[in-house]
């Protein structure tokens, strides 16, 4: 295991002096160390026992971590002494599992086994459709929606509620046509039969029917008619059609 150590304890805090001390870490200079040289424990420039001294700049820590990343193999570990600058630089460089040992004042990070920029296929996979069971209470042989046949409409219900269209000619009064199919002819025949049955025979009881309405009783069948000869009224049978308006 090769360890690179640069002592910055006796160096002035000026950026120029730190940069010169950094350059003395020849093993981590650009091009001086082949990539993935170290298996583990690359200690970047810093104090004799660690990473970057208290006077190191954030830019210097970032460059050092970047070169340490290049020098490490996949899975290698970097150990450095420092504070927030060392931790942030290690994270930004790509190290994973960066932890801080507050007791020793050391920052430790691991170079992941995967390579940055690794390609992988985004080919979509076939979606598997899983059909869930209906449940323990489901039975394919049971039909819960049976229809009660007694609740169905019968032919009589359909005929009674069917709309009847009036196809007879309309004149002064609606009468059934010759080839009536709407039912008006049957209705008129039934009405005439009812009127014939309701005809009653009346005989004048008061004998004043011929004198006019002033002498007629309230139930006289001649109400509203002019006076006539008495001989025509006596014993005359009058047929009253209850279907007429009196």
UniProtKB/Swiss-Prot annotation:
UniProt motif (Cx2C motif 1) ranges: 206-209
Which region ranges are annotated with the description Fe-S binding site B? 206-220
Q: Which GO terms describe its cellular component?
A: mitochondrial intermembrane space
Q: Which domain of life is it from?
A: Eukaryota
- Signal sequence annotation: none
Q: Where does [4Fe-4S] cluster bind?
A: 206, 209, 217, 220
Q: Which cofactor does it need?
A: [2Fe-2S] cluster; [4Fe-4S] cluster
Q: N-terminal SAM-like domain: where is this region?
A: 1-124
InterPro entries referenced in this protein's UniProt entry, alphabetically: Anamorsin (IPR007785), CIAPIN1 (IPR046408)
* BP-aspect Gene Ontology terms: iron-sulfur cluster assembly
What positions does the entry give for [2Fe-2S] cluster binding? 168, 177, 180, 182
Q: Which UniProt keywords apply?
A: 2Fe-2S, 4Fe-4S, Cytoplasm, Iron, Iron-sulfur, Metal-binding, Mitochondrion
Q: Which residue ranges are recorded for the region named Linker?
A: 125-158
What segment(s) does the record annotate as region Fe-S binding site A? Answer: 168-182
- Localization in the cell: Cytoplasm; Mitochondrion intermembrane space
Record GO terms (molecular function): 2 iron, 2 sulfur cluster binding; 4 iron, 4 sulfur cluster binding; electron transfer activity; metal ion binding
Q: Where is this motif: Cx2C motif 2?
A: 217-220
**Where is it chiefly localized?**
cytoplasm
The record describes the protein's role as: Component of the cytosolic iron-sulfur (Fe-S) protein assembly (CIA) machinery. Required for the maturation of extramitochondrial Fe-S proteins. Part of an electron transfer chain functioning in an early step of cytosolic Fe-S biogenesis, facilitating the de novo assembly of a [4Fe-4S] cluster on the cytosolic Fe-S scaffold complex. Electrons are transferred from NADPH via a FAD- and FMN-containing diflavin oxidoreductase.
Record-stated family: Belongs to the anamorsin family.
Give the quaternary structure.
Answer: Monomer.
Q: Which HAMAP family match?
A: Anamorsin (MF_03115)
Q: What is known of its domains?
A: The C-terminal domain binds 2 Fe-S clusters but is otherwise mostly in an intrinsically disordered conformation.
> What is the name of this protein?
Anamorsin homolog
Where does this protein come from, organism-wise? Ostreococcus tauri
